[in-house]
Amino acid sequence: MKKTLIAAASTAVLLAGCATTEPAEDKKADKKVLHTMESYDLLSVDPADAITSNIFNQIYEGLYRFDANNELVPAAAKSHSVSEDGKVYTFKLDPNAKWSDGKPVTAENFRYAFERVIKTNSPFAYLLEPVEKTTAVDDETLRIELKRPTPYFLSMTTFGTYMPVREDIVKAEGDQFGTDPKTNVYNGPFTFKKYQAEQGYTLAKNAEYADRKNVKIDEVDVKIIKDPMLAINLFESGELDVAPLNSENVVTYKDQKEYNTFSDSRMFFIRMNEKTDALKDKKTRQAIDAAYDKKAMTETLLGNGSLPADYIVPKELDPKYDSARQIESSYDVAAANKVLAKQNLELTMLIEDDDVSKKIGEYIQGALKKQNVDVKLLSLPKKERLAREGRGDYDLSLASWAPDYQDATTYLNLFTTGNPFNMMGYSNKQYDRLLKQAESELDQDKRLVLLSKAESLLLDDQAISPVYQRKNAFLQNTEVKNLARHNVGTDISYKYVEIERK
């Protein structure tokens, strides 16, 4: 399912170096343009792929979305009702909803999209597991029947897997669907104006978007920048409106009016490939996790308030779940040394080719070296890291995950036997059984206990080594307002942005 994006031949190069004059041109034309960045390129614009999920919230629209205050609000749907038993959701679509080519958005577009996710064996098909049946009652009515009451279901409809696609476009594009942003149609706030692989893209306000009156900007210019210092320099020169900060820069900027922080729910963790002989033994995996100081790492390398993690379900995703579990630090150098010192392990660890990943990789590499473990770091673009993980071609891999919906299972389900994102060869029948029991448990307190037991078992098995829960420190132009950040689903929304250039 993971397809590589291609740039249309007619697409102009977006980045001609750092000496761009775009902001000045924006003012001349009285065009309101947000200038921002991403640290990695798009992988696909096919919602069934859903890996680069940030883009989907900008170009597509699901039944519901999170607004600027992180409240669930109607989107492509104008309203919904739920049956008394909590198992049937009926959505009434916005009659004004259109695709970017002017054709109406219909219930059949959603029904077909859901069916396609399953038929194409999308790695995200498991997100449709609660759904028993989807029916397009008429053009503006979609009925979704669930296997069981699912209290968090509405939040699931904000994610890419639940977004509509047009069957005629999919059939016309065939295997290339999602690889060229310019040949697709979109029902969200923005459409693609330009795309240049590994350099960036420009989004333009969708003239057919039903809620276009509330989209206050004309374009979003997104550059692909992997060097945080370059991003800061571009921010300082007025060529970026938003730039992330690393630990070296937080102290410099923390008292400035452009300085901002946001606590999100993205978890970073190390996958441990149990198919590798060196990592089959649970004690070895536990020793690797115990060998590095997560607290010192987050304070010295990140310095932005990110939390050291000895858990995989992020804090504050569900306060009730937080109350149902206990978290203990796993850091124990002496215990790690007893297991690792005489093994003379040689391991390869995959990291992405951004500055933060490299620093974390080097920190863990250094800590394990002290325990006589030789770790070779392999720095790769995100797409290549994912491909290596998918093939099982690694020992350790620094990965991350943000919640697709507002429930602990958005993390815990990843590690069940057979889940496409369980790329470590991990399988525990008791773990699977606990999650299956939680699936059918209607008493929410009992359900949370089952889930917390599953998390404890996963961590005791050391299928993964949790590293940290991210907090973002970033610079944002004070002329830019309402750049919404989310801790569930996609990270960010451009829809609500307002710009007043001075």
Predicted regions and their residues:
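Long beta-strand-rich cores associated with HINT superfamily self-processing modules
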Residues: 474-502
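Gly/Pro-rich hinge or "lid" segments in bacterial periplasmic/extracellular proteins
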Residues: 50, 159-215, 219
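Extracytoplasmic/peripheral linker and loop segments enriched in polar/acidic and small residues
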Residues: 376, 381-385, 413-479, 502
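Ligand-site clamp/hinge motif
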Residues: 208-251
